[in-house]
Structures are given as structure tokens and as C-alpha cells.
Regions:
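Flexible, solvent-exposed loop/hinge segments and secondary-structure transition points
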Residues: 1-139
């Protein structure tokens, strides 16, 4: 028998609150997405002033990170290094930009957090703050 864990609404709220707090601390705005282990959205927030495309990009980073169980930017780096298109995975939602971070709990990917609207480095830093906010409440 298999036991499956995945993020829910409560964890999504924690991650979004932590990411928003960090964005405000930096005087920045962006979009934050939290997805389940399949990469489907649980929650999405586009802060006032964030670019319109950032919400769709954050959602695609969540999809990529959860489905591949790795940071979203790893796909882009692999595609560049090996010379293939990220869409070879069969779904146009795969995205190779930094900013999506998987959440691992008990050796399982239970979902992911993504941020969009800043640089890739900043997006990933803030997404990881959301991941850590979730992990701090588990167990």
C-alpha cells in the first residue's frame, strides 16, 4: 500500500504569507503560486502592481517544479546544455526559469512554491522562504 502526502490550503496560506512578507521587506511585488504534488494550483496571489504575466509564469513554475521534483530552473539549464526544447516533455506548461521550488517531506515531493516578477535568483530565494515556512510547521 502507498501512503501519499501533499500540500493543502493551510500550507499554501503559510507559504504565501511568508513570501509576501519577504517581498514587502524588499519593497518588491510579484506573484506567488503554491501547487500540489502533481503541479496543480492550490493557491495563487498576484500582488498589487505585479506584472500581469507573472501570475501565469508562477503557476507554470509550480507545475514544472512539482512534476519534475526539482527547482524549475534546472529544466532550463538542462535544455540549454543538451540542446533540446523544454516542451519535449509533452506539456506547454513546462517552464525552465528559476523561481519554482519543490517541497520535500518524508522523502516525498508533496508540492511546490513558486514566485515570479523579479530576477530568477530573487524569485527562487523567496520561493524557498515559502518552502521553509511550510516545513517549519510539519511534524
Amino acid at each position: 500500500m502507498q501512503s501519499h502526502l501533499e500540500l493543502g490550503e493551510a500550507e499554501a496560506r503559510l507559504a504565501i504569507e511568508a513570501c509576501v512578507a519577504e517581498l514587502r521587506r524588499r519593497n518588491k511585488v510579484g506573484s506567488i503560486a503554491v501547487g500540489d504534488k502533481h503541479g496543480e494550483l492550490i493557491a495563487l496571489l498576484r500582488m498589487d502592481g505585479a506584472s500581469l504575466p507573472s501570475s501565469g509564469i508562477a503557476a507554470n513554475k509550480v507545475f514544472t517544479s512539482s512534476r519534475l521534483r526539482q527547482p524549475s530552473g534546472a529544466l532550463g539549464r538542462a535544455a540549454l546544455a543538451e540542446g533540446w526544447d523544454v516542451h519535449y516533455h509533452g506539456d506547454i506548461r513546462y517552464l525552465g526559469w528559476d523561481g519554482g521550488a519543490p517541497v520535500f517531506y518524508r522523502e516525498q515531493c508533496v508540492g511546490s512554491v513558486a514566485v515570479s516578477g523579479l530576477t530568477g535568483v530573487e524569485d527562487l530565494e523567496i520561493a524557498e522562504i515559502g518552502v521553509n515556512a511550510i516545513l517549519a510547521t510539519l511534524d
